Every structure is written in structure tokens, then in C-alpha cells.
Regions:
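Short S/T/G/P-rich N-terminal loop/turn motif that feeds into the first structured element of a domain
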Residues: 1-180
């Protein structure tokens, strides 16, 4: 889920989510895998990643959350005035979600749109080349989008800082196996 916020609202939304949203939700309505604020690319956004055992479980838990009085009476009234729009992607992982070995990272979420019928072959090729790519940095997860943006693949990378990201990407681009991919 991606929220696009009014300019300047990120700190308020982050604090509200940390202090109130997490207290209400915990992992009782889906497991929170990550929560990020954008600083490069589309600005004024908060991206959060939730995992569920199935689409049916997601629907059931979202229904239960919508009946939670604290969610609807306390959290949403503080969030909604800051929200301009939201985007929801339903994604299936083909590289399992895994937390990075260290904290305090910057994250890069890359999304690509494939031609119709080409997303699954691309994802398989990407999964196959992952051992080569992970010689340089570990992938935090990769997904095929089922809804929101069909024919889209997203993957997430953690780096200690932007300089390390630039250096890592430069090394990856020099790898002959990666170049073949």
C-alpha cells in the first residue's frame, strides 16, 4: 500500500502510524514487513508492505480491521486529513521477503512493467540470476503484481547508504553473468 500525502505530512503520518496504528493493528490484521518514507522519486509518500497467507485471509482481516472501533474512530480520523490518494498492489513473492542483516538502511524499491504474458518468464529469469546479483547485495524480496498494475514486477534492496548503492550497482553492471541477463 502506498499513501501519497499532503506535502509536509510525512512526519505526522509516521508518528501517528508508529504510536497509534501499530498499537491498534499489531500483526493481527496482516504482518507488517516494512514501512518506508520516500526521499527520492515520487515524494510525499509512505509505502508499507503487509503479508498474508492468502488473498482470502487478506479480505477477512481487512474486513475485521474495518470493524475495529479504535481503527475507525482514532487512527483513520488522524490519517485521512493528510492523505491525498492511495494505491494498493496485490503481489505474490517469487523471492521471499527477508529482513536485511543490519538496521538503519536506505531501501530501493524498483518496479518494472513487462509486456503482457512476459512477466512470469522475466520473474523466473530474475530468480535464476539472483545468486549472481546477491554476490553484491542481498535482495529483500521480489514480487509479481496480481492487481494494481498487472504485468509488473517489483523488487526491494537494502543498502547502508546511497554511496554504497551507487558502488554496488556499478559493480553489478560489470559482472559478465549479470550483463547476459
Amino acid at each position: 500500500r502506498t499513501y501519497t500525502l499532503k506535502p509536509g505530512a510525512q512526519p505526522t503520518v509516521a508518528q501517528t502510524s508508529a504510536e497509534l496504528g501499530r498499537d491498534i493493528r499489531g500483526d493481527n490484521y496482516g504482518r507488517l514487513e516494512g514501512y518506508w518514507m520516500t526521499e527520492i522519486g515520487a515524494l510525499n509518500q509512505v509505502v508499507h508492505l503487509w503479508s498474508y497467507e492468502s488473498f482470502e485471509e487478506r479480505a477477512r482481516l481487512r474486513g475485521e480491521l474495518s470493524q475495529n472501533g479504535r481503527w475507525t474512530g482514532e487512527y483513520l480520523p488522524r490519517l485521512l486529513p493528510n492523505l491525498m490518494r492511495q494505491e494498493v498492489r496485490i503481489m505474490n513473492a517469487f523471492v521471499p521477503v527477508k529482513a536485511p542483516a543490519t538496521e538503519g538502511n536506505i531501501y530501493e524499491l524498483r518496479c518494472y512493467r513487462a509486456k503482457p504474458t512476459k512477466v512470469k518468464p522475466w520473474a523466473q529469469a530474475f530468480a535464476n540470476i539472483m545468486p549472481v546479483r546477491e554476490k553484491y547485495s542481498a535482495c529483500s524480496g521480489a514480487w509479481i503484481c496480481e492487481s494494481g498494475q498487472p504485468n509488473e514486477v517489483c523488487h526491494l534492496w537494502a543498502y547502508p547508504d546511497l554511496n554504497t548503492r551507487v558502488e554496488t550497482r556499478a559493480k553489478v553492471m560489470q559482472d559478465p553473468q549479470w550483463q547476459e541477463f
